[in-house]
A protein has these predicted regions:
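Bacterial N-terminal signal peptides
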Residues: 12-24
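Terminal targeting/pro-maturation regions of precursor/exported proteins
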Residues: 26-91, 124, 412, 419, ...
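Conserved PDZ fold ligand-binding element
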Residues: 61, 134-156, 243-246
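PDZ/PDZ-like peptide-tail recognition elements
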Residues: 76, 88-127
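PDZ-domain C-terminal substructure recognizer with occasional recognition of PDZ-binding tails
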Residues: 124, 146, 160-201, 351
């Protein structure tokens, strides 16, 4: 069995709220990190418990009222083994594993929505992919899909009810949505399309000041970011004086890609460390020399939809005093998942580490507070700590302060630009004084 270096664009329970490990080469430096409090992994096999499991398996196999094949029974057992661990560990049967691998290629057929499977098997919308059918139809973070094509989501027999959202491009699907604050569901019909996953977009806000949005972190996000940054510099007629980096509603992706993105804007120092029970899970990532903006100020936008790898970038830039954070407290997913190939087409997605920001903070179930709070829409039940069986955090937010805030619209971009211009003006004044003194 081998760990698979794949991204997680799978539309399933918290589909891309992941910081998946990958083996892609990094410009950043990678060092082993040791967690002195982590217990050593045990290789002991609990023989008595395994005998008990075998007895239960045989009893069900032989005596259940209806015949049940061994593979189905074993898959159920493996799912149950992972069910009580944490919401991001999961068993992926071959169909789900192949869909995950398909998503890594940057293209899939569906409606372009990220969802969380709730205990009643309804689907809570985490975010809609820019330009996809769900985004065009106005699906919002916090909407709950209670029925698909007239069938209650709880009645769908598939282990992952979100698979019903997928289908051949050009086919339609009818969703019943329950929106927060509304008593009755609304129906909306969407036409599936081939979703080309472009993770970065950008534009020039005004001469010298750029805007880059990262929708998620996949294999070539850092390269896309470099291309967009170069295009902005050409459009501006030279190096940028400042940048607004928008990570709102970014549910995460590859940890190694997040490291590459943070590394673009840092001259050195730590980016993130991961701490788990195995040697492979304990890693410190450091930035290599070379800041793509040459120190020009950065403002980062975040909200409750900013999760996992996006939180890695925000935390690294803030702890290194490289960026000002604006918006609302982030989601609070501070764990790393590894995908393990089981050799028969099935796979195991297992939480193997917590990550820590350069200042040593774990954001698990706590999130990252912005430096400047912006107004938004408050909705309860959207954060990591609201998920059943979530990993305990070092500094979880008390329930009374756990409301998630969605920060939408261009007013947030305008405020971020104003702050960046202030910082750029101060930087230029400092440079003039230094030149005058010299």
């Amino acid at each position: 069995m081998a760990a698979s270096p794949v991204d997680a664009m799978r539309l399933s329970p918290l589909p891309i709220l992941l910081a998946l490990v990958a083996s892609a080469p990094l410009r950043a430096q990678v060092e082993p990190a040791v967690d002195p409090l982590a217990p050593a992994p045990s290789s002991a096999v609990p023989l008595e418990e395994i005998r008990r499991f075998a007895e239960v398996f045989r009893t069900v196999q032989e005596g259940y009222v209806d015949p049940i094949d061994d593979r189905t029974l074993m898959q159920s057992a493996v799912r149950a083994l992972l069910a009580d661990l944490d919401p991001h560990s999961a068993y992926l049967p071959a169909t789900s594993a192949s869909e995950l691998a398909e998503d890594v290629q940057g293209m899939y057929d569906g409606i372009g929505v990220e969802v969380e499977v709730r205990p009643d098997r309804s689907l809570k919308v985490i975010g809609a992919i820019d330009g996809g059918p769900a985004h065009k139809a106005g699906l919002r973070t916090g909407d709950v899909i209670v029925a698909i094509d007239g069938r209650p989501a709880g009645s769908l027999r598939d282990a992952d009810p979100s698979r019903a959202l997928r289908g051949t491009a050009g086919t339609s699907v009818r969703l019943s949505l329950l929106r927060p604050g509304e008593a009755l569901p609304r129906d909306v019909v969407l036409v599936r399309q081939s979703i080309a996953l472009s993770s970065v977009s950008g534009r020039l806000l005004e001469p010298g000041y750029g805007y880059l949005r990262i929708g998620y972190f996949e294999g070539d996000t850092a390269d896309e970011l470099k291309r967009q940054l170069a295009a902005l510099q050409v459009a501006s007629g030279g190096p940028l004086s400042g940048l607004v980096l928008d990570l709102r509603n970014n549910p995460g992706g590859l940890l190694t890609t997040a490291v590459e993105v943070a590394d673009l804007f840092l001259e050195g120092g730590p980016i993130v460390s991961t701490r788990g029970r195995t040697a492979a899970s304990n890693v410190l990532y450091r930035a290599a020399a070379g800041d793509a903006l040459q120190g020009a100020p950065i403002a980062v936008l975040l909200d409750v939809g900013t999760a996992s790898s996006a939180e890695v970038v925000a935390g690294a830039l803030r702890d290194q005093r490289r960026a000002l954070l604006l918006g609302a407290r982030s989601f609070g997913k501070g764990s790393v998942q590894t995908v393990v190939d089981l050799g028969n087409g099935d796979a195991l997605k297992l939480t193997t580490a917590r990550y820590h920001t350069p200042a040593g903070r774990s954001i698990q179930a706590a999130g990252i507070l912005p430096d400047v709070t912006l107004p938004g829409t408050a909705i309860r039940g959207l954060r990591e700590q609201d998920l059943p069986t979530h990993l305990a955090g070092d500094a979880e937010v008390p329930d009374g302060y756990a409301t998630g805030v969605i920060v939408e619209g261009e007013s947030a971009v305008a405020e971020a630009l104003r702050r960046v211009k202030q910082a750029a003006a101060a930087r230029q004044a400092t440079a003039r004084r230094a030149t005058s003194a010299g």
